[in-house]
């Protein structure tokens, strides 16, 4: 069974360019604004959307994404509403892949079987659950794969050749290479090391490898995209939302417009990546 992620990645491979994968926090700063951000992403140049599920204890996230999650929770965002957001987006876009990203606890409380059924019905294509190691694949990964949802695993600079096959064992859709250790939103890693790491991962899998953590500008997206199948941008997008919110959360400009402007520039960087690499 091929998913929207598989089809999108195959299409981009024939076009000879990497994917731009964009992360935003569902419900930040409120449901309607967040939905308008999501709807603006494909037109601005996003190839795959990562929809963040807010959680009260986001241990892998840096201050920007933590703050976005808290704003979303304060605004009343729940997993039910996040799935509803995906469903509303799907009503107008049946092509752009959606990956839910977050932590296992809200899914566990929701109920795995119910969650997978509702996620499929909402048009979800993949899951990134950062706190579920391969040793717990029976919990969610295997049921998700059986349901036809990609389970995307993270690899890091500390994932050595002994550990890598285990990490890749039930991974599908793409591999998400976290280009540094630590929390999201840290400084960009050395690009030469990133290229070597991508090649090392590709020695173990035929899956596309997308690189994230630290990409903020079109130039960074271009450089990373020259050696990867996809470039993931998250913190910069979350910051674009935060930057148009006042001290009490009031909007000083349109968050969807701010995000679209940023993503448009990133998309240009990604689209020029292979051209630059070929020169």
Swiss-Prot record:
What is the gene name? trpA
Describe its assembly: Tetramer of two alpha and two beta chains.
EC annotation from Swiss-Prot or TrEMBL? 4.2.1.20
Name the InterPro entries for this protein: Aldolase_TIM (IPR013785), RibuloseP-bd_barrel (IPR011060), Trp_synthase_alpha_AS (IPR018204), Trp_synthase_suA (IPR002028)
* Lyase in keyword set: yes
Q: Where is the active site?
A: 50, 61
Q: Which PANTHER family match?
A: TRYPTOPHAN SYNTHASE ALPHA CHAIN, CHLOROPLASTIC, TRYPTOPHAN SYNTHASE, ALPHA CHAIN
Gene3D superfamilies referenced in this protein's UniProt entry, alphabetically: Aldolase class I
Name under which the protein is recorded? Tryptophan synthase alpha chain
- Pathway(s) annotated for this protein in UniProt: Amino-acid biosynthesis; L-tryptophan biosynthesis; L-tryptophan from chorismate: step 5/5
């Amino acid at each position: 069974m091929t998913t929207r992620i598989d089809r999108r990645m195959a299409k981009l491979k024939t076009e000879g360019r990497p994917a731009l994968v964009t992360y935003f926090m569902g419900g930040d700063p409120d449901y309607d604004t967040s939905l308008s951000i999501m709807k603006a992403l494909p037109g601005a140049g996003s190839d795959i959307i990562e929809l963040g599920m807010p959680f009260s204890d986001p241990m892998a996230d840096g201050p920007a994404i933590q703050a976005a999650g808290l704003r979303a929770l304060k605004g009343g965002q729940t997993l039910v509403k996040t799935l509803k957001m995906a469903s509303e987006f799907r009503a107008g876009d049946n092509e752009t892949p959606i990956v839910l990203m977050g932590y296992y606890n809200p899914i566990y409380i929701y109920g795995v079987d119910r969650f997978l059924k509702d996620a499929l019905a909402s048009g979800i294509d993949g899951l990134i659950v950062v706190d579920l190691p391969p040793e717990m694949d029976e919990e969610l990964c295997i049921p998700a794969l059986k349901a036809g949802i990609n389970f995307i695993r993270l690899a890091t600079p500390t994932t050595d050749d002994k550990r890598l096959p285990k990490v890749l064992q039930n991974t599908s859709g793409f591999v998400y290479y976290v280009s540094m250790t630590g929390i999201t939103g840290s400084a960009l890693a050395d690009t030469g090391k990133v290229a070597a790491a991508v090649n090392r991962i590709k020695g173990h899998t035929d899956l596309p490898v997308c690189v994230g953590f630290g990409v903020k500008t079109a130039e960074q997206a271009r450089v990373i995209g020259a050696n990867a199948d996809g470039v993931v941008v998250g913190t910069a997008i979350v910051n674009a939302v935060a930057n148009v919110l006042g001290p009490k959360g009031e909007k000083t400009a349109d968050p969807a417009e701010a995000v679209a402007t940023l993503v448009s520039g990133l998309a240009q960087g990604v689209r020029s990546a292979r051209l630059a690499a070929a020169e």
